[in-house]
């Protein structure tokens, strides 16, 4: 019989893993795990060990694991027609129906959907659209895109440049020249630096910094601004009060397109269909992935607004067929999975559950950790939450990075059979469980997290990193 160790040893020899210390993993000095199944909010490894997946894979398994309806939809579509390209006007029934459903959910002002396979490639498409749009309008110099520090938009050359996290730039010669990064809407630390600044004042400050950057670069060179409604991988940071209204006003003033990256927030995660709806954002372009299929198949998309679509049509009238395409765009199996997934979200009221049970998640996290000696902030929205750890919560001071407090918290949670993610920048533990999560499951997530956090806190106290209470 093939053991778990056998599989991991084989894996070490042949697989290039993302976000992994490649040498340590290949030489057996970093752990591996083979996942064999899942049901609801739990996954199981080859040894039969069961974990609560408090992060829904990577914020993506919105409907939970083991949904036979989606598997059946993929199977039936594979029997009927597994693949044909969608170039030069070719289509398939699932693509048409899924596009109609996405546009219905997105609401007025959105015109068409273009498909890819990942959020990264969707944002590559966004940048090509932005360039093409301005070339058609006779503005070839208007090509710069402003993103935000701590934003996450992918890990390609262009999409990785949009990402505002150091680990995705270092040693890759990123960002590319046309990408800029403005201040993150991260009120928690800014308020500590400038005591007395309200959330509304901080939002105005962020908008002023954006306007300052646009003016410094030259408004005739800045094409677009991209942002997640809620910062995801940058720390699960909901925007401060009034932030998006202030930002949108600046973009309108300088004729800068707004790209809403809904890869994490879309399809119910915030308790609304889209994070844009939750915060009153009016984007020109929207990026989608993850919750679109709940990761039962790879699928991403770009939703193109009316304003942009009119120019794209105009461009092909002048230049001929648009020079962009992916082999797997509009893949029939992915679109079939998307349709089945969105039907489950709608039928079972999972967006409403993300709002209601998500509110309970926020309440329970705050009750458990608001006064904890190493927790500086408890934050979140909908079915997303984060704990930010601090050596001195009153002063909001960071731990020494060498202590690796975030990774230690994540490892301690894993010992409690709970998956919670150590975010890549700062000592932050993130949660984004499936939208199917119940109140009872929230209670279990919080209980396991308490045990993990207390275990690491005790260790830090013994090490002299913090003072005993």
Swiss-Prot record:
Entry-linked Pfam families: Aminotran_3
N6-(pyridoxal phosphate)lysine: modified positions: 290
Top-level lineage group: Bacteria
A GO molecular function held by the record: diaminobutyrate-2-oxoglutarate transaminase activity
Main location: cytoplasm
Additional notes on this entry: This reversible reaction is part of both, ectoine biosynthesis and ectoine degradation.
Protein name (Swiss-Prot/TrEMBL): Diaminobutyrate--2-oxoglutarate transaminase
């Amino acid at each position: 019989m093939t053991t778990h160790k056998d599989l991991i040893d084989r894996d070490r020899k042949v697989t290039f893993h993302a976000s992994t210390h490649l040498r340590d993993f290949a030489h057996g000095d970093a752990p591996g795990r083979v996942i064999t199944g899942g049901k609801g909010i739990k996954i199981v490894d080859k040894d039969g060990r069961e974990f609560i997946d408090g992060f829904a894979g990577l914020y993506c398994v919105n409907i939970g694991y083991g949904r036979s309806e989606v598997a059946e939809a993929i199977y039936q579509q594979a029997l009927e027609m597994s693949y044909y390209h969608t170039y030069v006007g070719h289509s398939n029934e699932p693509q048409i129906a899924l596009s109609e459903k996405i546009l219905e959910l997105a609401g007025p002002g959105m015109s068409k959907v273009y498909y890819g396979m990942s959020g990264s490639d969707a944002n590559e498409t966004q940048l090509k659209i932005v360039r093409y749009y301005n070339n058609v309008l006779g503005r070839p110099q208007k090509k710069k895109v402003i993103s935000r520090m701590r934003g996450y938009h992918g890990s390609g050359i262009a999409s990785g440049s949009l990402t505002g996290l150091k680990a995705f730039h270092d040693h890759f010669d990123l960002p590319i020249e046309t990408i800029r990064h403005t201040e993150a809407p991260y009120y928690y630390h800014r308020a500590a630096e400038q005591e007395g600044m309200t959330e509304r004042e901080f939002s105005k400050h962020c908008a002023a910094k954006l306007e300052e950057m646009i003016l410094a670069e030259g408004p005739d060179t800045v094409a677009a601004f991209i942002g997640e409604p809620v910062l995801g991988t940058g720390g699960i940071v909901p925007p401060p009060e009034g932030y998006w209204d202030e930002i949108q006003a600046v973009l309108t003033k300088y004729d800068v397109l707004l790209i809403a990256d809904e890869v994490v927030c879309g399809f119910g995660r915030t308790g609304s269909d889209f994070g844009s709806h939750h915060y009153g954002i009016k984007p020109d372009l929207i990026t989608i992935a993850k919750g679109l299929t709940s990761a039962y198949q790879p699928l991403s998309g770009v939703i193109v607004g009316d304003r942009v679509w009119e120019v794209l049509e105009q461009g092909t009238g002048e230049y001929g067929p648009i020079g962009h395409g992916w082999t797997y765009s509009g893949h029939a199996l992915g679109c079939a999975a998307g349709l089945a997934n969105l039907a489950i979200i709608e039928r079972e009221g999972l967006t409403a559950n993300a709002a209601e049970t998500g509110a309970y998640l926020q309440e329970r996290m705050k009750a458990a950790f608001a006064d904890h000696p190493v927790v500086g902030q408890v934050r979140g929205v909908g079915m997303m939450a984060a704990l930010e750890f601090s050596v001195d919560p009153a002063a909001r001071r960071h731990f020494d990075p060498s202590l690796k407090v975030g990774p230690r918290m994540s490892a301690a949670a894993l010992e409690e059979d709970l998956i919670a993610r150590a975010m890549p920048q700062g000592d932050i533990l993130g949660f984004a469980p499936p939208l199917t999560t119940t109140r009872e499951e929230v209670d279990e997530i919080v209980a396991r997290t308490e045990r993990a956090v207390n275990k690491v806190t005790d260790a830090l106290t013994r090490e002299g990193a913090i003072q005993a209470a």
